Amino acid sequence: VTAVDYSTKMLEEVRRNLETEGLKAELHQMDVQSLEFADNSFDAVVSRNVFWNLEHADKAYEEAYRVLKKDGILILEDGNYYRRFFSDKYQKAYDEFQRGHEKEEQGCHARHNKENVDFSIMDEIAKKLPMSQVDRPDWDFNKLVETGFHKIQVEISGSPLPMSFCIVAQKG
């Protein structure tokens, strides 16, 4: 198992979690948009909540394809977390969700905000990110086809609009 993250703090967290669970993995600090691994290195690439915050998600898909062995699998979990800033229909769905859960502590941020993080900072960053401006997973599907992936399966969560999704794709 090999783990990659751009943030050294996240890698420290991974290291602690591995130690707690008695597991081992190689940890590397690098940019998924420019991986330092040789071609055809991995059987699988797994990504969770990474692509939404990339400047060049297309390059990250190309890199995943490059480092996967033939018939290797990409598993991606991601979402349209900040699409509401650029889409009226997403903003409307977000507002309706918020109204329906005013008295509950809902959402990932509310459930996991252990240090009183000011999420308005993340909102401002997300407004500048290109993936907040595209309809996903449609964009991802088209990019995967263009990159050479096949046997692409998409599972969407969220109603009435896709808020999060999981994609499994195979290298041709």
List the model feature ranges, each with a label.
Residues 1-34:
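Class I SAM-dependent methyltransferase SAM/SAH-binding core
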Residues 9, 54-59, 84:
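Short N-terminal helix/helix-N-cap motif within the alpha/beta-hydrolase-1
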Residues 9, 17, 48, 60, ...:
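Ligand-binding pocket scaffold of soluble enzyme catalytic domains
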Residues 33-44:
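A short acidic, Gly/Pro-enriched loop at the edge of an enzyme's catalytic core
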Residues 44-57:
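A short SAM/SAH-binding and catalytic strip from SAM-dependent methyltransferases
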Residues 58-73:
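A short glycine-rich, Lys/Arg-flanked "PGG" loop and its adjoining helix->strand segment in the class I
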Residues 77-160:
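C-terminal alpha-helical "lid/dimerization" subdomain adjacent to the S-adenosyl-L-methionine
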Residues 147-150, 165-172:
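C-terminal lobe and adjacent flexible extensions of AdoMet/dcAdoMet transferase-like proteins
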